């Protein structure tokens, strides 16, 4: 376990390991680490699919190969985004997770570090897609990028005169499947992590204080104000709530000093697509 909080007084937000995350065992370890890191914190994984499988000694340089490799190797966890292929810029080749992590941080920073907006369709440092020195693949367009997105793979495409990161989904997503809503978009799960991590940061210093009615209500009020603030910023929609439920707090738990607050929140979804339908009229 990494002691990020202890060493840097910071909560891990994004975990990336360019190159290493192409190994399925490393990917699984990353997913395990970011769930309740040090017993408390949740974070998000940015991982790469390989453009060459060293174990199989085979190039992964087409859309079909990338989709099949991701599926057969279990790169489909909702706590992650997976990226393919690599990209070129200024004579260098970059793993796309590198560009994605920087872009995520930049977008988060534009919202005071609230992960309310997807890094998708944001400009990245790229002049071409890269599939390997010996690959015959000369690249693909946004339509092919959408095909990758439908399988939970985020990519890079030339769109609107810019090279951009393309795909707002987590690796869990597959078009047409009945899935868990919180894992559909990257902003969904990252916002929920932001809320739970924030709860612990705000109230961690109160642990082992006397839990009387005043403290219970104070936490309720503080958390509702936080949710209302996030809604006011556009990070949440609907009516987010926090409750202290009797059913979630049986006497046996209270006697042991264990208390639960239930938070319900709906992150604001991204504007994934828009269609204008035009019909002719002679009126």
Which residues are covered by each model-predicted region?
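Short, small-residue-biased leader/transition segments that mark boundaries at the very start
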Residues: 2-4
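Acidic, low-complexity glycine/serine/threonine-rich segments
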Residues: 182-246
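A glycine- and small-residue-enriched flexible loop/hinge signal that marks low-structured segments
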Residues: 7-202
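Short, conserved loop-to-beta-strand elements that form functional interface hotspots
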Residues: 47-51, 55, 239-248
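Short, flexible loop/turn elements at secondary-structure junctions
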Residues: 16-21, 246, 265-267
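Composition- and surface-driven signal marking solvent-exposed, interaction-prone regions
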Residues: 29-31, 219, 241-242, 275-279
């Amino acid at each position: 376990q990494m002691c990020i909080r202890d060493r840097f007084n910071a909560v891990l937000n994004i975990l990336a390991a360019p190159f290493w995350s192409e190994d399925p065992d490393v990917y699984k370890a990353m997913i395990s680490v970011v769930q309740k890191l040090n017993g408390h914190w949740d974070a998000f994984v940015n991982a790469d699919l390989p453009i060459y499988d060293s174990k199989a000694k085979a190039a992964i340089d087409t859309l079909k190969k990338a989709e099949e490799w991701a599926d057969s190797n279990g790169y489909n966890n909702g706590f992650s985004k997976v990226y393919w292929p690599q990209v070129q810029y200024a004579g260098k080749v970059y793993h796309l997770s590198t560009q994605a992590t920087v872009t995520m941080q930049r977008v988060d920073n534009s919202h005071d570090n609230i992960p309310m907006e997807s890094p998708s369709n944001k400009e990245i440092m790229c002049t071409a897609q890269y599939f390997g020195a010996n690959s015959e693949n000369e690249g693909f367009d946004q339509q092919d990028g959408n095909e990758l997105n439908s399988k939970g793979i985020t990519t890079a495409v030339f769109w609107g005169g810019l090279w951009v990161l393309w795909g707002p989904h987590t690796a869990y997503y597959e078009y047409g499947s009945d899935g868990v809503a919180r894992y559909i978009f990257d902003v969904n799960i990252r916002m929920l992590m932001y809320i739970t991590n924030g709860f612990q940061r705000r109230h961690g210093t109160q642990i082992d204080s006397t839990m009387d009615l005043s403290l219970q209500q104070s936490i309720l009020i503080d958390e509702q104000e936080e949710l209302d603030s996030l809604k006011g910023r556009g990070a949440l929609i609907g009516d987010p709530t926090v409750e202290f439920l009797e059913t979630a707090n049986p006497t046996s738990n209270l006697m042991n000093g264990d208390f639960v607050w239930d938070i319900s929140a709906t992150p604001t979804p991204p504007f994934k697509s828009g269609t204008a339908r035009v019909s002719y009229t002679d009126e």
